[in-house]
């Protein structure tokens, strides 16, 4: 990718994915200082869509007014370089399906998803894909589409979405919502053996790799959306406490850790 394109990409308006506040009882992580928890009672009567919170890299896919494919992560466009290794799959996949994506997204929509090619804190051994869509932003209205609206927009195509665990009125108690937390749908009971095999195949130190890996069977947490018929109006996350402890115990951010591929 040329320096000219990098400069051009950075000049484009980037729709950054909004920060997600924590729900009552969720364990705060580094960078969350100063952000209060949202009380569960604030969700009373709301229509919720609850998803498994996957541990990957936030990625956006969109198109310029000239129809050029653009990929972004957090606050910048992906413009090449060694630090973008984990995005290699999604770059190839998006380019292969650029025609279909352009037809659905145009320069109006930004599709956000989780890129799962590299292990962050959680190792997955049963991923059906390495990109999972979870939100679509409408530049024309300044709103995020509801789950049914996203499904309609992306129907009959190559896009997989994050697992949905519940759709309906907010459960009466926080405990009822937390009961949705269970083993990750993207891990098998044999994931530990698969992890060790992958680490050895990569020629990495197994003890250190385990130090930098979440050891729980449970998913990272829950991602909760508040929706109307056509719009996602708010989103919250609930992260289990021992997941955050696993991050602290690793002593190194995932971006500084060796590349261990998810399966």
Q: PLM features: residue spans?
A:
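Core nucleotide-handling region used for phosphoryl-transfer chemistry
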Residues: 2-263
